[in-house]
């Protein structure tokens, strides 16, 4: 579903991603783990087209999107939830979700979105700025799902969110994968969350992958060492 091969990204003359490559299959969740400044957000910005890659390729469902602008990547199946819960604070919950339906045939919010996030249905007429941080994150995910993506990218979705809501988000992502049958890629620092949602885990350090394992491989201790250095 998502294939990244030998991706290089630079800021000016400084190379920050060095030949990164991974894949995420349909109905699979992949976690990119790493400390701050190791390249997670840079990678995600490159995947969504906000930063140009100097080399490498990206394919979504077999289609090469390497040279596409962000909006074209969205049209071809990329959904993106950026770091920091970026929602429209003056719009209602329902209006926020509908911004993801701008080019859809119908402006009706898909039923499964409210089924995945019941709290958003209860608050659908409330302004986004009046929601808690956890509710805003659920809203950001719901808006990305409204585009009916084939691949959902989430950059540090648990940042600044209370533990009880983190568990709700983990349950929702597992349900999204099952119901929508999409590929999900998350960047994370919280290992417990990654182990709850991910089939495979990568550790990025200095713009390179330095570790890869499956959830069942029992490598949690090794990954924790990378995150605590």
Regions found by a protein language model. Give the residues of each.
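Conserved ABC transporter NBD signature motif
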Residues: 56-64, 76, 106-110, 115, ...
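Helical segment within the ABC ATPase nucleotide-binding domain
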Residues: 167-180
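ABC ATPase signature
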Residues: 91, 131, 144-145
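The feature captures the beta-strand-to-loop junction immediately N-terminal to the Walker
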Residues: 33-35
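ABC ATPase NBD coupling module
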Residues: 52, 64-85, 110, 122-126, ...
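A short, proline-enriched helix->beta-strand linker immediately N-terminal to the Walker B motif
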Residues: 146-150
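Helix-to-loop junction immediately C-terminal to a conserved catalytic motif
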Residues: 48
């Amino acid at each position: 579903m998502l294939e990244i091969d030998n991706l290089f990204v630079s800021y000016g003359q400084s190379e920050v991603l060095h030949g990164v490559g991974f894949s995420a299959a349909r109905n699979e969740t992949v976690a990119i783990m790493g400390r701050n400044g190791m390249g997670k957000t840079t990678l995600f910005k490159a995947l969504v087209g906000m930063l140009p890659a100097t080399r490498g390729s990206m394919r979504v469902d077999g289609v090469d999107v390497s040279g596409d602008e962000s909006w074209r990547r969205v049209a071809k199946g990329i959904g993106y939830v950026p770091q920091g819960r970026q929602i429209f604070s003056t719009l209602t919950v329902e209006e926020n979700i509908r911004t993801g339906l701008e080019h859809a045939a119908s402006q009706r919010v898909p039923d499964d979105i409210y089924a995945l996030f019941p709290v958003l249905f209860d608050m659908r007429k409330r302004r986004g700025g009046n929601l808690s941080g956890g509710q805003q994150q659920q809203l950001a995910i719901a808006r990305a799902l409204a585009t009916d993506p084939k691949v959902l990218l989430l950059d540090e979705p648990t940042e600044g969110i209370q533990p009880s809501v983190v568990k709700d988000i983990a349950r929702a992502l597992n349900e999204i994968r099952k119901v929508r049958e999409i590929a999900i890629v998350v960047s994370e620092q919280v290992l417990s969350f990654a182990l709850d949602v991910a089939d495979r885990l990568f550790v990025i350090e200095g713009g390179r992958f330095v570790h890869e394992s499956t959830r069942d491989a029992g490598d949690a201790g090794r990954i924790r060492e990378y995150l605590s250095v």
